């Protein structure tokens, strides 16, 4: 309230397009509720306006109407306005997308290149994710065909996190020797040949490369509290290296990164940036493969081809779209066995523990889904069943006015909380099992406190 972005006060104007109401969206200057597919189309539509294509070359957006006072404003009109604002901001503008779609990321890339955004530097991409889905699928195939002789797993729990965990479990049984480097005896560690307990990252040495040419050093806050050893030290000892991982890092940095700069100073600062970072070249395997030229040099035909991958001329509407999001408290679910995090209320919905589906009131009314408060302040309501391939999940439905129509939003990490029930009330005490994937029991709350979900009546199948 009272926020007026302008050049004078140095505030940036923020526009959010999303399906689920996020903290960022709730604080945006303008928020438009769209399904994930509509967000991709909005990006493409915005790009074609920035490129200045003729009217007869445009791909049209769905004619959904947004009611605003007495005026009817189409989503198409709103996207045109966004494109105009981006064009006016020029180099000071930035477009980012969190959609898990290569096409959407490419169009966002192209928009930023077209605007010559100062905040966008493709030569120094962030390296926070280095996963390779194709390589993982090949590993699963090789494991199940008996082609893997030894498997080392570091700080990962595939039997918990993979969507096709059954295939990994079957393949793991065919691997003669396997080791899991993990802090806990999780699902994967319990199935491998050996479990090598790891120290906490605050007890460990390490180094990182945030983006190309930008490095950081990780220093332990305390000595390991338990009888654990870093996986790097394990491998160094196995290959006959007598020095610890600390000296290995130091030698590597002095030879390949610092090149004359003081190790003690780098350790003191915690970070180090190469002086020749502006001329740093991307490795060939890291270059974006889908665009042979930088987007600024794309011809009209190439731009239209890129847009058409997301915004076809014939639009096919689906009944519902699944819009997964990450829990603020649990993140990717690695700490799902922490009851304090399970008890932390969601900052938007005020819910704790159980997972749920967010749904727009109009969709809920169409399906006959309702929520109601009981006399003790708890929230009750209907459940919905979501099926994909041969799997299905059942979850309570939380009716959310800010949800985009035609979409439902479950948290992505909470369907697989198998080890989250490993909570002990006292040292050596009995294990308390909790069914976090569907129900946690009738949890009551006093009026005005966090809302606990417990849905017992009815079931609706959503056609995704």
Report the location of each language-model feature.
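Gly/Ser/Thr-rich loops at beta-strand to alpha-helix junctions
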Residues: 99-104, 157-159
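Anionic-ligand anchoring segments at beta-strand to alpha-helix junctions in alpha/beta enzyme folds, i.e.
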Residues: 106-138
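Periplasmic-binding protein-like
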Residues: 92-98, 150-155
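Structural alpha-beta junctions
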Residues: 4, 112-121, 173-177, 238, ...
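Non-catalytic, well-ordered alpha-helical segments in soluble enzyme domains
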Residues: 229-254
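Short hydrophobic/aromatic-enriched beta-strand-loop microsegments
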Residues: 32-35, 117-120, 195-200
């Amino acid at each position: 309230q009272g926020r007026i972005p302008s050049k004078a006060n140095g505030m940036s104007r923020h526009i959010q397009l999303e399906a689920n109401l996020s903290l960022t969206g709730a604080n945006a200057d303008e928020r438009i509720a769209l399904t994930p597919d509509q967000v991709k189309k909005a990006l493409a539509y915005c790009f074609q306006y920035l490129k200045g294509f003729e009217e007869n070359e445009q791909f049209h957006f769905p004619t959904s109407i947004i009611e605003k006072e007495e005026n009817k404003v189409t989503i198409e009109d709103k996207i045109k306005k966004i494109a105009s604002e981006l064009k006016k901001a020029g180099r000071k503008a930035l477009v980012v997308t969190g959609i898990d779609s290569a096409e959407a990321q490419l169009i966002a890339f192209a928009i930023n290149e077209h605007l010559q955004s100062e905040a966008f530097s493709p030569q120094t991409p962030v390296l926070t994710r280095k996963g390779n889905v194709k390589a993982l699928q090949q590993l699963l195939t090789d494991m199940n065909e008996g082609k893997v002789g030894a498997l080392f797993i570091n700080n990962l729990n595939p039997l918990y996190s993979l969507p096709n965990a059954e295939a990994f479990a079957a393949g793991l049984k065919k691997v003669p020797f396997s080791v899991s480097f993990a802090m806990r005896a999780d699902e994967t560690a319990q199935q491998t040949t050996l479990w090598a307990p790891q120290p906490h990252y605050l007890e460990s040495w390490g180094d990182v490369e945030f983006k190309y040419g930008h490095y950081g050093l990780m220093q332990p806050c305390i000595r390991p509290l338990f009888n654990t050893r870093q996986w790097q030290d394990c491998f160094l000892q196995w290959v006959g290296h007598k020095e610890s991982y600390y000296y290995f890092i130091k030698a590597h940095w002095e030879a390949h990164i610092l090149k004359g700069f003081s190790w003690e100073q780098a350790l003191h600062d915690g970070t180090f940036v190469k002086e020749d970072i502006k001329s740093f070249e991307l490795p060939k395997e890291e270059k974006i493969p889908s665009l042979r030229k930088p987007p600024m040099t794309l011809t009209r035909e190439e731009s239209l081809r890129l847009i058409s991958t997301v915004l076809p001329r014939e639009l096919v509407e689906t009944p519902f779209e699944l819009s997964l999001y990450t829990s603020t408290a649990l993140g990717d679910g690695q700490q799902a066995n922490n009851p304090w995090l399970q008890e932390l209320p969601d900052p938007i919905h005020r819910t704790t523990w159980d997972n749920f589906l967010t749904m727009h009131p109009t969709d809920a009314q169409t399906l006959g889904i309702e929520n109601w408060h009981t006399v003790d302040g708890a929230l009750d309501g209907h459940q919905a069943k979501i099926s994909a391939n041969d799997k299905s999940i059942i979850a309570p439905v939380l009716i959310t006015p800010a949800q985009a129509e035609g979409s439902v939003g479950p948290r992505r990490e909470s369907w697989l909380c198998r080890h989250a029930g490993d909570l002990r009330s006292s040292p050596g005490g009995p294990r308390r099992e909790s069914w976090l994937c569907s129900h946690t029991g009738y949890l009551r709350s006093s009026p005005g406190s966090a809302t606990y979900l417990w849905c017992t009546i009815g079931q609706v199948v959503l056609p995704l």
